[in-house]
Regions:
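Conserved phosphate-binding/catalytic region of the ribokinase-like
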Residues: 2-134
Length: 134
């Protein structure tokens, strides 16, 4: 594949081959992954990808600065993708919801995401600047 996972390169399109191999090997319905760009302990870029065997989708990228607490960000993403796949019209909308939920969690102290569905949807459907503000 074209992705250099060990070197930490975050070229999302390069992960498509890895996702295809995972689907072939394990028979997953979806393969989903987040990509973090770490500029400092309190400043990260954040996006994700989803693949269903036919369509590969990359979310918009969020610039999270400052990060208040990363703990719970992965759980928030996982809950967001489950919610999104159950309620949104397509995998792209589901992924945008999950990434927005996780990005917002990075701005909250503690391991619980205390935002509403409406707040997540407002960020996911925002102006695409990718700037997380609370």
């Amino acid at each position: 594949p074209d992705a250099d996972v060990e070197a930490g390169h975050t070229d999302a399109e390069g992960y498509k081959g890895i996702f295809q191999q995972m689907m072939k090997e394990f028979g997953f319905k979806y393969v989903v992954s987040t990509l973090r760009e770490s500029f400092s302990a309190t400043h990260n870029g954040w996006k994700a990808m989803i693949y269903n065997g036919e369509e590969f989708y990359t979310s918009k990228r969020y610039d999270i600065d400052p990060i208040i607490d990363r703990v719970g960000g992965g759980d928030s993403f996982s809950g967001g993708i489950i919610h999104g796949l159950m309620t949104k019209p397509n995998q792209g909308a589901a992924l945008e919801f999950a990434v927005a939920a996780s990005a917002l969690k990075h701005t909250i102290n503690g391991d619980f995401n205390l935002v509403s569905v409406e707040e997540v949807e407002a960020l996911a459907g925002g102006d695409a600047s990718g700037r997380v503000q609370r």
